[in-house]
Amino acid sequence: MKRKALTRCAGALLLTAALALGGCGSAGAGGTVTNETAAEKTKQYVYQEEEVCFSDINLSNVYNIQYANGSLYMNGGRYEDDAAVLFYAVYDTEGNQLSYAELSFENGGETGISENIFAVGSGGDIYAVQTVTTNSGNEEDYSYNAVQRIVRRAMSDGSEIASADIAMDKNSAVGDYVNQILSDGKGNLVLITSQSVLIYDEELNLVKMLKAQNSIDNAVMLRDGSVAIVSWQDKGIAFQKLDLSNGQFSEAIVPENMEGYSFYAGIGYDLMTSSSDGVYGLNLADNSCVQLMNFVDSDLSVSSIYNLSAVSETEFYAQYYSDSDNSSHYSKFTKVKPEDVKTKITLTMGGIYIDSTLLSRVVSFNKESDDYRIKVTDYSVYNTDDDNTAAQTRMNADLIAGNIPDIIVSNADMPIDSYIGKGLFADLYPFMDGDNGIDRSRYLTNIFDAYAVDGKLYQLVTSFGVSTMVGKTSLVGENQGWSYEQFEQFAAGLGAETDVFSQATRGEVLNNFMQLSGGEFLDWNTQSCKFDTDSFKQFLAFLNTLPETINYDNISEQDWSELDAVYRNNRAALLMTYVSTFTDQKYLSQGQFGEPITFIGFPEESGNGSAISPSLVLAISSKSANQDAAWSFVKSFLEADYQDSVYNFPVSLDALEKKAADAMQPPYYYDVDGNKVEYNDTYYVGSVEIPIHPMTQEDVDQVMGLLTSLNQTLRIDSSLMNIVTEEAAAYFAGQKTADETAQIIQSRAKIYVEEQE
């Protein structure tokens, strides 16, 4: 069966940006090289994309795509009523469909048939693993079984040529099934389970059964005819080569800092793999791993690549999911010669665990700018299983040494106050008010001001949530905010039947209070500590009334059901929570508490004890030679397309008003035909279903009142937290008084603050 030829989507020559990090270990910190040398070096990682547009094929329905015998083979499926429809298709590299076949399997009741994995034989036939599953259909005595067989199919029409049941090792664990089938193109088929390797010939005769030395997580047929066995072990990803001729496994190879999860046969390299930042080549003989392609350099908004097939040392086909348009693509990628890549002025951006949304906007900026490109350094590659603080340590060392990216992606673990004190960040207010600025009156200026120091804004929050404490208005009153003294009086005044919190340990409360109102005891601007105050001593005394641990194993199902209703029944008064959308208010008031609530916040002598918990914070280096260009990128996060798209609270008033209006409407979704369908919202308290109604204007006003009153920021300083918890432990154990403990914490904290200068 022939179908019309495929069309090719327009490819784009992609330019330069990020310094290679990740995948197979770090290649060095981005801040330690100049922008000029970085621009030249990253030209090595640029690939041109030429998208293949498959007519009449929805890539979301495709299971596998393989390059074999000069053609592209794929299979996929969809469900129609009680039938599973499987298809196989073949295309040539020019985009013409060579064959297409559909098979229908009746799937219903207790039986299901699937055929998701396949390999291409030496003659072009398909060898698939078919799985037939059955279940007892009895909910009280449920059982499940799966039987697998190899099916040889003619590629022209999908017809079955032959089949054979798969011979499993009798000693294999129950549930050990074939999850991969490979072909060496020379008559050998290799079936992979989690414990065994089964070798068949193309006539479906079992030739050899091998027991793996370790659990098998992945396997790849290499170009030399051997099989790379991949296992995830305690020390990392381990590789072994299996010689099919003699059934011998090589010694295990464990590369350092290997981050790839899917591996494919390479050309010029044993294996190719994709990481969050690009594609890498790996040779097992010398344990070498090098970056081949960088996604950002190549103007690709993608977090991973799969179904990769190498066709030469400089070309490969692969499928990827685009973060920019939320759809799947299949493309041919060809390496661009470094001398053919246009040189632009390079802006550097550094952060830890830079997410796909941010990278997508970097790609958009790089495409749209004629003069600038952003180079991304994600320091998270320095983290290991043994040290998850290595990234923060390395980035901090670079910044302190003066190797500062033009754009900094901030996080709560950074010693931001110290950076500001050293003059590392630029004031953003002049940019906001300049020719390429914004109308500040259309934003939550209190959010900006909360991050300002002495009238200067060094960090820009683009969206946020609120960490706060909530109670019934009937218990805590209507006003937001209270002091430590008021909090202590409230806690002491509760009856014996009402706990302050539900199921909260002293460690949880201490951690939350220090993050959300710890600024009460430490002022980085003045380098002053106030841990020896009566407020802090009273807080220690309150913490001592809370349990150190909670044994959740002793909580019965009935107790769990009652815990759902503790706030409704006044068995607990305060909830430490996180609010990120308008609708969170209705679930709290109508659902969890069952009556009007107040965002009372954490105790804070100087203001509202609810804290801004930012989703994304950006800063610009005061040392940057390209601050205007950096601001152009940062400013894009304040524009409508971004502000309207964020899930949690935007800083734009226009975007907030849209979200508020939506919250006052019934919830809805769009069906498969694109029709808007409204539905009734509910909340469960135990097994009781509670109807949740759309928010009223009064509800929306309450949330807006919370947002416009925020003036505290979430603070996380692990070193300071360690000082407090270490010394407080002696007080909780009865070894020191509150006065002694407060004095020791005050002394240690003061020394710590002074050392940060």
Where do the language-model regions lie?
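Conserved N-terminal structural module of periplasmic/extracytoplasmic solute-binding proteins
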Residues: 25-82, 86-89, 93-95, 132-135, ...
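Short, solvent-exposed loop/beta-turn-alpha elements that line the ligand-binding surface or hinge
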Residues: 429-442, 519-541, 601-611, 734
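Extracytoplasmic "Venus flytrap"/periplasmic binding protein-like
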Residues: 375-443, 564-566, 571-574, 590-592
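Hinge/lid segment of periplasmic solute-binding proteins
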Residues: 413-468, 485, 596-603
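Periplasmic-binding protein-like
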Residues: 496, 634-668
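C-terminal capping/gating helix-and-loop segments adjacent to ligand/active sites or protein-protein/ligand interfaces
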Residues: 612, 672-749
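Helix-loop-helix "hinge/cap" segment bordering the ligand-binding cleft or interdomain interface
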Residues: 92, 156, 452-557, 622-628
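Extracytoplasmic/periplasmic substrate-binding proteins
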Residues: 546-628, 632
